[in-house]
Structures are given as C-alpha cells and as structure tokens.
Amino acid sequence: MIEDMTKFKILLTPWHGTPIAPPYIDSTFTEDIKSKNPYNNPVYSNDWFNYSPMRAGKPIPLTDNYKLPAHFYWICSNVKRLETDYYSHSKGVVLSSCLFEFLKQFKCYDEYDICEVTPLSRKLAPISDKKYYFIRFKHLAYNLFIDLENSNRIKRMNKVITSYLYLDFQLREQTAYPDIFWMKNVLVAKDSVADLINGNGFSGFRMVELKDFVDEYTFRDTHPYPTLEEMKDRDRKWF
C-alpha cells in the first residue's frame, strides 16, 4: 500500500554561500603530492577519476582500474578555511564525517564507494579541522520507488539538456520506503528525517520543501546574471 502521507524535503545549497561554505570551489583531487604544484600536476594510480557507472546508456563494470584509492588530497583554490559539511562535485559528493555518520543511521538503498579526503590550500596547508569523505555513487535506487514520469514536475528553464524540478513524487506501490535517498548529488529525506538534519546545524546546506526548492531554482534559472546582492538576498531567505 502506498504511503500517501509520505512527504519529503530536498537539499538546497546557498546561491552565493560564505567563505567557509562556498557552493563552488575551484579544486583538484590528487592521491599524492609529488611536486610543488599538485593542483596542476595531480597523481592518480588508476583511472578512478574518469569512472562513470553508466556510459551511452550502458552500465560500466567497476574494475580495479576504476576503484577509489583509500585516501586523496583535495587541493582547493581561494579557500582559507573550510567548514562546510556538504559539497557537490562532478564526480560525487564530499561529506564531513559528522554528516556522513549522522546519515548512516537512516535507511538508504543507494550503493556507493567511499574514501577519506584531506582538504588543503594551494600552498598545501590544512584548511579544516573536520574529517571528510568522498562518496561516489555506484547505483541510485530512487527509480525503484518513485515514478518520475508521473510525478508532479515542471521543466527547468534555459537548460540545453532537458531536466525537471519536482513538486511532489509519485510513489510506487510497495511496503517500505527509504528514510533518505540521493538523486544524483542531491539528498532527499522524509520530512521527519529532514527536520532532524536541519536541527543538527550542519553547514553548507538546508533541507527544504520540494515546492520551495522548485521556487528557488526557477528564480535562479531565470536570473542567469545575478548581482552579488541578489544572490545574498536570496540566501537570506533560507539560511
């Protein structure tokens, strides 16, 4: 029986952000530091950085050539101090150990690889007291319990590749649903769990109602050249 009353919140990051929790960081991953400039000379022991679980619609086997290292350095430009608990990267997400351990207590069907991350400045100085993990998703399970085609959604504006924003999810009929799940790099959680996440004071994001997320990204999509003040003003609405 479908849980008609199941509602969700979704992760929203600041538009402008703060110096200690920026929404975008010019950065490089490297497994080792073998030069004075690892930002421009990263070291990889295999091809893990180029792994994608799907290519041309076909699954790519996770061979040894694509396996994550146990640890790598995250070389960040123009960041003197890093306090964020969440950062979205093109290859996965970076989570603080505090957030990762907190999320582990909740039911989740997604599959992922994980390794430790040490953030450093371009001068190779530590920029955070927090411990971080890099999460690379192998399989996202949301299609198992959400019918995206029949969900209440709107097409995003000004996008070359068609994508959608969801006002509500059409749940498939099953007996149980996860407490949290990931849609690409975006965390979605049941209302009660999202409220617990917000109540823990994590930095760099907030869990918001789906409608609020749609409203915010519709505004951002229709304002491609915002001023800093416009961005900060929107952030004050949520953070």
What are these regions (language model features)?
Residues K58-S90:
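A glycine-rich, hydrophobic loop/mini-helix early in the fold
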Residues E83-F145:
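Extracellular-facing segments of soluble proteins and assemblies that are Gly/Ser/Thr-biased and enriched
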Residues W15, I20-Y24, Y39, L62, ...:
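Generic low-complexity segments that are intrinsically disordered, proline-rich and/or Lys/Arg-biased
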Residues W74-K80, S96, D168-R172:
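Short amphipathic alpha-helical segments, especially helix-boundary/capping motifs
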Residues M1-P61:
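N-terminal ordered "arm"
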Residues D4-M5, T118-F239:
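Acidic, proline/glycine-rich low-complexity IDRs
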Residues G57, Y66-H71, K107, N152, ...:
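Short, flexible coil/linker elements and helix-boundary hinge sites characteristic
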